[in-house]
């Protein structure tokens, strides 16, 4: 690991039972698993792995672990092995039980609490191993420590094998194997990609740690070794791999005060949006917090000061925070004792002193960097000044949009057929491609809660456009006004007029293009819509099957064949009329209602954002200027395309 972290947060070499503190019992976990892991869906299933890996990361942060291996065995059994000191096996004074037993059977037991264990810990709630144990069909732990192998086994949280010495060893570390309990989870199949994303993130954030992910369900097994000596500098380069930097080097800033450490990596590219990713104790903080606030304030101050010093900025003609962040990619990682996470989803860092720490580091070290690298400083300042001029050019269009955003103004777009309901949580808006489909949708809808907005012509690709082109665009303007929440830094989800925003486009090239353009716009300028789960794509059926008065619709070739067989169950020779829907515009209002708009029958696909970094990269590839990465991406992913009318 880097020298910065080797000298910080090292506990005493002796990691024993005295450092394990017990706060409360484990009884409630199986009754209310969502309270401890968020949900029993896929995210909760994968959270089990993160909890065990976080224990190994804690050992790494303390300076005692360099290698972590995560394996998905057959039958979706998970194995996590590290070369840390090994969980203590001696008797824990508070309970009279071995520390190993306490860690796996008592909630909130671990070295994350109290003064003698880890000073910095990655676990958000610290629930850790005991919750994984409670929610597993079975769990087995082996500790290699002081020449012996200690083993315990559990079933749904209960001990089935007391701590036992099962052999001798010449290494140290902990190995945990567990099988998630199908009684607890909707699905127990692990996604290699989801685990890979999280583990790669951890490898970037902890420079020098080696994390190996293996999927033994594949034949041959799929393995990837992740180790990034450059840490978050490499993370920024990874994010920017399909973008064009305007200065060659990633800027790295770091510092510490007492037990708190901060490191920041920055690089500007020629894109028009910002990408700032922040972490506290290796936990992603998508809602930002004090570390981001300190970073943004200092960044704006330093760039303005450099502009004044070099006579590029004169008088009060300062650039704004929005200007200086155009095109920036930044990773901010802070590690601190007793991190306080705020907000409803606990995704915002609240420790006020971290703002001062990060502000001071950026103010001092970025100023120094600009002095030593005038070419990079000039390129960054020029980009901010260009953004400033574009922002000024966009101001009038922006004011026009702002004046017409509120419902009370009564100035809704001509293309909007609004609904009667005024409670946003009950309202939905269909964004419909073309006047023909919009006409059928308007006639077929339930006007009590369904609004229709027709889109026509070629939409603007916001990935290739600066803000001044977006605010006054005649295709985006009606959408911005209809939704009522503003865009960019001024977007306010509380003002959103509809909590279901449904893109309704054909399954052909043009429809897919419109969907992609809309999603690019939402991702870049209204991202909270996606983060809150308000954006959907309508899934119109491909086939209509008719037998006499009986009608059914199918969304795939497989479903068509299955329904056809079911409709002939009583008479194998019965005639089934199968017709293919050619497009939304060719459906009559009744067909459009019962296939695509009726809440009882329709199929909607919610647009989710599990991995913001990957999404950022994909939008850059698909919608950006560079053709070659797009060609490569299409070649790699073409095999996954089905049911596309060409």
Task: Kindly give the residue locations of the regions a language model identified.
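A short glycine-centered beta->alpha linker in the GHKL/HATPase_c
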Residues: 86-91
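Mature N-terminal segment immediately following signal peptide/propeptide cleavage
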Residues: 18-31
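Conserved short strand/loop->alpha-helix "switch" segment adjacent to the catalytic nucleotide/phosphoryl-transfer site
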Residues: 31-50
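C-terminal interaction appendages of subunits in large macromolecular complexes
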Residues: 389-408, 423-428, 439-445, 458, ...
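GHKL-family ATPase ATP-binding module
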Residues: 1-16, 26, 50, 58-60, ...
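Short adenine-binding "F-helix/F-box" segment of the Bergerat
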Residues: 92-93, 100
């Amino acid at each position: 690991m880097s020298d910065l972290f080797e000298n910080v947060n090292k506990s005493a070499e002796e990691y024993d039972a005295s450092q394990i503190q017990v706060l409360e019992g484990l009884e409630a976990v199986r009754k209310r698993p969502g309270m401890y892991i968020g949900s029993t869906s896929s995210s909760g299933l994968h959270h089990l792995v993160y909890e065990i890996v976080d224990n190994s990361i804690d050992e790494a942060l303390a300076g005692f672990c360099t290698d972590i291996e995560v394996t998905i065995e057959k039958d979706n059994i998970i194995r996590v092995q590290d070369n840390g000191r090994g969980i203590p096996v001696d008797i824990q004074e508070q309970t009279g039980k071995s520390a190993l037993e306490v860690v796996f059977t008592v909630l909130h037991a671990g070295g994350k609490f109290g003064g003698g264990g880890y000073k910095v810990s990655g676990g958000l709630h610290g629930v850790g191993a005991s919750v994984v144990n409670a929610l597993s069909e079975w769990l087995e732990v082996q500790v290699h420590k002081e020449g012996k192998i200690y083993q315990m086994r559990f079933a749904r949280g209960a001990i089935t094998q007391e701590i036992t010495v099962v052999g001798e060893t010449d290494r140290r570390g902990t190995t945990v194997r567990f099988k998630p309990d199908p009684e607890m989870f909707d699905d127990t199949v692990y996604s290699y990609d989801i685990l890979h994303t999280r583990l790669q993130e951890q490898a970037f954030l902890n420079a020098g740690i080696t994390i190996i992910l293996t999927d033994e369900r594949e034949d041959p097994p799929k393995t990837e070794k992740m180790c990034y000596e450059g840490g978050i500098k490499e993370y920024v380069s990874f994010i920017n791999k399909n973008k064009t930097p305007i200065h060659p080097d990633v800027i790295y800033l770091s510092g510490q005060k007492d037990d708190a450490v901060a490191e920041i990596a920055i690089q500007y590219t020629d894109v028009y949006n910002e990408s700032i990713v922040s972490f506290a104790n290796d936990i992603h903080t998508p809602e930002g917090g004090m570390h981001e606030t300190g970073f943004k304030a200092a960044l704006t101050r330093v760039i303005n000061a450099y502009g004044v010093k070099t006579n590029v900025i004169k008088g009060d003609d300062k650039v704004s925070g929005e200007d200086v962040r155009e095109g920036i990619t930044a990773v901010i990682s802070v590690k601190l004792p007793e991190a306080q996470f705020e907000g409803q989803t606990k995704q915002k860092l609240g420790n006020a002193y971290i703002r001062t720490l990060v502000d001071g580091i950026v103010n001092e070290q970025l100023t120094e960097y600009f002095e030593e690298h005038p070419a990079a400083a000039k390129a960054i300042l020029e980009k901010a000044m260009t953004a400033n001029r574009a922002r000024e050019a966009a101001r009038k269009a922006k004011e026009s949009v702002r004046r017409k955003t509120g419902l009370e103004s009564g100035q809704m777009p001509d293309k909007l057929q609004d609904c009667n309901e005024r409670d946003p949580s009950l309202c939905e808006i269909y964004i419909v491609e073309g006047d023909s489909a919009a006409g059928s949708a308007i006639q077929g809808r339930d006007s009590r809660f369904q609004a229709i907005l027709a889109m026509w012509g070629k939409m603007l690709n916001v990935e290739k456009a600066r803000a001044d082109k977006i605010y006054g665009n005649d295709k985006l303007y009606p959408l911005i006004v209809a939704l009522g929440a503003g865009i960019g830094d001024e977007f306010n989800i509380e003002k959103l007029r509809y909590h279901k925003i449904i893109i309704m486009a054909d399954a052909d090239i043009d429809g897919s293009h419109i969907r992609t353009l809309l999603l690019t716009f939402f991702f870049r300028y209204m991202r909270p819509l996606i983060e809150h789960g308000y954006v959907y794509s309508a899934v119109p059926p491909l086939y209509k099957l008719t037998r006499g008065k009986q009608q059914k619709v199918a969304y795939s070739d497989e479903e068509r064949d299955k329904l056809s067989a079911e409709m002939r169950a009583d008479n194998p020779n019965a005639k089934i009329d199968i017709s293919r829907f050619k497009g939304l515009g060719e459906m009559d209002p009744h067909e459009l209602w019962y296939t695509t708009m009726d809440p009882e029958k329709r199929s909607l696909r919610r647009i989710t954002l599990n991995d913001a970094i990957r999404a950022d990269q994909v939008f850059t590839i698909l919608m950006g200027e560079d053709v070659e990465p797009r060609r490569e991406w299409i070649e790699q992913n073409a095999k996954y395309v089905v049911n596309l009318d060409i």
